[in-house]
Amino acid sequence: MGSDFKAIPLIDISPLVGKIDDPSMVNDEDLLQVVQMLDDACREAGFFYVKGHGIADSLMKQVRDVTQKFFQLPYEEKLKIKMTPQSGYRGYQRVGENITKGKPDMHEAIDCYTPIEPGKYGDLAKPMVGSNLWPKYPSNFDVLLENYISLLRDLSRKIMRGIALALGAPVDAFEGTTAGDPFWVCRLIGYPVSTDIPEEQRTDTGCGAHTDYGLLTLVNQDDDICALEVRNQSGEWIYAKPIPGTFVCNIGDMLKVWSNGIYQPTLHRVVNNSPRYRVSVAFFYESNFDAAVEPVEFCRERTGGVAKYEKVVYGEHLVQKVLTNFVM
């Protein structure tokens, strides 16, 4: 939320996607231009679109389509993968079960996380131990989503390499103990038409104003429904209008801490005033689950020499949010 931006920048990241893992990439002018655009976007808006990302438009649409087909199933069928504390907070949640700042959100969703084996991370991860609950229908759901998530993990890693360079850090600064084993979250979200929600439950907000927890979010949204809004420094809400074939990206809380506030996450919300059901698939690229994220030295030096934020263990941050996010 660094400026009074009126629009969200669009960045063609194809030079970065193609060359960021090449040791000679520091001399590539096209790649360095993308890095500069990432820096500008992270400072000014905290949001940006990416094209040239290498994920097929047909795959992005297929993921949205199977998500919509699942939400069209009878309620009893959807409840077969119902989210519970026993499921590690993975699975289906009905409209109004997710809460933002005390108010129910008018969406339904499937929540997926990096699978966690019992005992991994000790007590830190105990509430989230488990594997993802994939629906039986549509029949290709699990294979499709697992492939999609794998591709987005790698794309996110490449974008974070560009963001590392934008901050003046080594290209692999977000690897190793920070995000060498990145945790991920994927939320498949459906926003019903408001008139389809019982009046006693209805609010005007599909998802209340919030910032994201981790490093980077990539949103695959319907091509033709405006609903995602981003707040600029003056408090105006700016539409993140759909641009077919792009991801809407935004930075999160962990990047704010790591950069000592050089990059700030931006408040955003979803208001679905469309007469049609809306689908959005959000992929969250996080630090290592057990990473202790704190302002790094060279970012402190660039911001007055003092850490503006205390150390945060990402897994503690996530578990605290998850345990207070739902009414079941």
Swiss-Prot record:
Record field: catalytic activity: L-homoarginine + 2-oxoglutarate + O2 = 6-hydroxy-L-homoarginine + succinate + CO2; melatonin + 2-oxoglutarate + O2 = 2-hydroxymelatonin + succinate + CO2
Gene3D superfamilies: B-lactam Antibiotic, Isopenicillin N Synthase, Chain
Enzyme type, top EC level: oxidoreductase
Positions that bind Fe cation: H210, D212, H268
Keyword annotations: Cytoplasm, Dioxygenase, Iron, Metal-binding, Oxidoreductase, Vitamin C
Predominant localisation class: cytoplasm
UniProt binding sites for 2-oxoglutarate: R278
Tissues expressing the protein: Expressed in roots and shoots.
PROSITE patterns hit by this protein: FE2OG_OXY
Cofactor(s) essential for the protein: Fe(2+); L-ascorbate
EC numbers, comma separated: 1.14.11.-
Bound cofactor: record note: Binds 1 Fe(2+) ion per subunit.
One Gene Ontology cellular component annotation held by this UniProt entry: cytoplasm
Coiled coil: none
pH note: Optimum pH is 8.0.
Domain Fe2OG dioxygenase: 183-288
Superkingdom, natural source: Eukaryota
Gene induction: Induced by cadmium.
Sample GO molecular function, one term: L-ascorbic acid binding
Compartments reported by the entry: Cytoplasm
Keyword Transport tagged: no
Endoplasmic reticulum among keywords: no
Temperature characteristics of this protein: Optimum temperature is 30 degrees Celsius.
Cited function: 2-oxoglutarate-dependent dioxygenase catalyzing homoarginine 6-hydroxylation thus producing 6-hydroxy-L-homoarginine. Guanidine (Gd) is in turn synthesized by the spontaneous conversion of 6-hydroxy-L-homoarginine to (S)-2-amino-6-oxohexanoate (RHEA:79843); guanidine is a nitrogen-rich compound that can serve as a defense or signaling substance. Involved in melatonin degradation. Catalyzes the hydroxylation of melatonin to produce 2-hydroxymelatonin.
Family statement drawn from the similarity comment of this UniProt entry: Belongs to the iron/ascorbate-dependent oxidoreductase family.
Protein's name in the database: Homoarginine-6-hydroxylase 2-ODD-233
Native organism: Oryza sativa subsp. japonica (Rice)
Upper classification of the organism: Eukaryota, Viridiplantae, Streptophyta, Embryophyta, Tracheophyta
